[in-house]
């Protein structure tokens, strides 16, 4: 199948036309309207500094039902000890920059380019991209960020500078998302790390159907507060 070159307007081809590896289209920009259109259609950007903007819709898709969250026993002990304090939207830009700096086994460089950082900071200022932070005292020990639309949360990346910090942030974030009415967490592609927490692969068509239902719900827009579920302030 051909790889589509995006037009100037924020429109995308049918995800069913993606390559076997999930690559769907190339080009366009990272303006908020295009990013939000992409997420609403089950498409996300992923590229490195040496590549043009690439857009993906893999099949199968990894997702987590917040109600199906599994917490490994060893992590349950860490949570009970209260080693880390978890917050939301307290340090978004610091979180995304640490995710960009994180070394990943078998990967040279980062896909979170300066252009990507700027794009998601813009979404954060619009109240549509959010971070969860794990703190060890006053030190940022780990965290994650993603995008919220309707009753869906699209996880993007996480980092840890201390043992289990990102795992604690992830568990607390999913617990909060569930209490706030979020129906699915998009984990994009399979990793054994996320499978251990209850994520599972589903056919792209099933993911898109569930996403469409989730988008019928209102978006939790604004600054989130972890201490209280429901609509943010």
Curated annotation (Swiss-Prot):
Keyword field contains Transmembrane: no
Record flagged with keyword Transferase: yes
InterPro entries attached to this UniProt entry: Acyl_CoA_acyltransferase, Leu/Phe-tRNA_Trfase, Leu/Phe-tRNA_Trfase_C, Leu/Phe-tRNA_Trfase_N
Catalytic activities: N-terminal L-lysyl-[protein] + L-leucyl-tRNA(Leu) = N-terminal L-leucyl-L-lysyl-[protein] + tRNA(Leu) + H(+); N-terminal L-arginyl-[protein] + L-leucyl-tRNA(Leu) = N-terminal L-leucyl-L-arginyl-[protein] + tRNA(Leu) + H(+); L-phenylalanyl-tRNA(Phe) + an N-terminal L-alpha-aminoacyl-[protein] = an N-terminal L-phenylalanyl-L-alpha-aminoacyl-[protein] + tRNA(Phe)
Enzyme Commission number, as recorded: 2.3.2.6
GO MF assignments: leucyl-tRNA--protein transferase activity
One GO cellular component term: cytoplasm
Gene Ontology biological process terms, A to Z: protein catabolic process
Keywords: Acyltransferase, Cytoplasm, Transferase
Localisation per UniProt entry: Cytoplasm
Superkingdom classification of source: Bacteria
Pfam family, one: Leu_Phe_trans
Entry's family note: Belongs to the L/F-transferase family.
Function: Functions in the N-end rule pathway of protein degradation where it conjugates Leu, Phe and, less efficiently, Met from aminoacyl-tRNAs to the N-termini of proteins containing an N-terminal arginine or lysine.
Protein name in the entry: Leucyl/phenylalanyl-tRNA--protein transferase
Organism: Anaeromyxobacter dehalogenans (strain 2CP-C)
């Amino acid at each position: 199948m051909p790889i589509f070159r995006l037009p100037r307007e924020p429109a995308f081809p049918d995800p069913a036309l993606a390559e076997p590896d999930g690559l769907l289209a190339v080009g366009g920009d990272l303006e908020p309207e295009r990013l939000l259109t992409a997420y609403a259609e089950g498409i996300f950007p992923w590229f490195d500094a040496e590549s043009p903007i690439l857009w993906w819709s893999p099949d199968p898709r990894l997702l987590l039902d917040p109600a199906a969250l599994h917490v490994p026993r060893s992590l349950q002990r860490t949570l009970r000890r209260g080693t880390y304090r978890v917050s939301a939207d307290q340090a978004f830009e610091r979180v995304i920059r640490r995710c960009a700096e994180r070394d990943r086994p078998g990967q040279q460089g980062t896909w979170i380019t300066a252009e990507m950082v700027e794009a998601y900071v813009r979404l954060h200022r619009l109240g549509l991209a959010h971070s969860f932070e794990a703190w060890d005292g006053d030190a940022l020990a780990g965290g994650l960020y993603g995008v919220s639309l309707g009753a869906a949360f699209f996880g993007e990346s996480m980092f840890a500078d201390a043992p289990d910090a990102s795992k604690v942030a992830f568990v607390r974030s999913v617990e909060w998302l569930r209490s706030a009415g979020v129906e699915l967490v998009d984990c994009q592609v399979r990793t054994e790390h996320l499978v251990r927490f209850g994520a599972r692969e589903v056919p792209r068509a099933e993911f898109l159907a569930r996403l469409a239902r989730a988008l019928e719900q209102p978006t939790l827009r604004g600054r989130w507060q972890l201490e209280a579920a429901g609509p943010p302030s």
